[in-house]
Amino acid sequence: MTPVARNILIACIAGFLLQNWVAPELVDTLALWPLHDLPVLPSFQPWQLVTYAFLHGDLMHLFFNMFALYMFGPSIEQVMGSRRFLVYYVVCVVSAALAQLVMQAVIGGFPRPTVGASGGVFGLLLAYGLAFPHRRLMLIFPPIPMPAWLFVTLYGLLELYLGFTARGSNVAHLAHVGGMVGGMALILYWRFQRRSPRY
């Protein structure tokens, strides 16, 4: 793997091990907590906009995010370069967090923390579809091959739909969309600046 993608993967695995077997209280400090006025619960802190992405809800959550990072991260890092890749990933993570905070503020309800690298991963998926639009990707179910641009488009639309319809879900669908939107905004900025030969 490329260096930044590898280090993100290692950090996420380390974060998962720490939160589950060494220091479960990390969730109180590092998970993304919504804005609320309940003194008995942890509250939002600025660093949580990034740190939540290194924690995960369970082993399957970690596995699928790290599998996607392994599949798409190195190709994007090779295209962007390591420094720009890191900036891009962090922007996607933060934009996903902001989308989640807005969604939680609008919907309300009992405050629950958000964890996971999915916002960053969805940003990488978007970048992959733009950089390699005609590469074939396979759906898990049903197992249908399709070009990357179509895979990304359908997946993004599905997440947007679920974000407004699956209100009771434990999956932060609009955070996924937020990661893609943040990634797209940064790519458009780079295109405008003409600093990225591939984008």
Regions found by a protein language model. Give the residues of each.
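A detector for small-residue-rich transmembrane helices and their helix-helix packing motifs
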Residues: 1-199
